[in-house]
Amino acid sequence: METASYKGAHMNLDYIKGVNLGNWLVLEKWMNPALFDGTTADDEYYLPTQLDPAVYEARIKTHRAEYINERDFATIKSWGLNSVRIPVPYFIFGDRAPFIGCIDELDKAFNWAEKYGLTILIDLHT
């Protein structure tokens, strides 16, 4: 019996060889405890309840701008990988106060992935 394999619309992938970009758009305290400094919050859900709104916003925006960037996508490609997994939160569009959406960062990731010939696996991770 022969089985068919899926080939991406723009890429010829026989195997997914990738890396997880966790803690970028969905915070994981165990991966970067510094984001939770000054709080007793254990996860992103409780973090904004324990920080001044301006501090929370600045911390999140700085983290998202610096934690993963285009250089990382170039490096991933140079390692011979062809895919990245990006966990995203349910508030990706920014419609759930006090959380800050991250659709702009995901859009950048798609542009970088296209530039470096990578595919993206989006994982709703909430």
What are these regions (language model features)?
Residues 70-126:
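Substrate-binding cleft and catalytic face of glycoside hydrolase catalytic domains
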Residues 1-81:
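N-terminal carbohydrate-binding accessory modules
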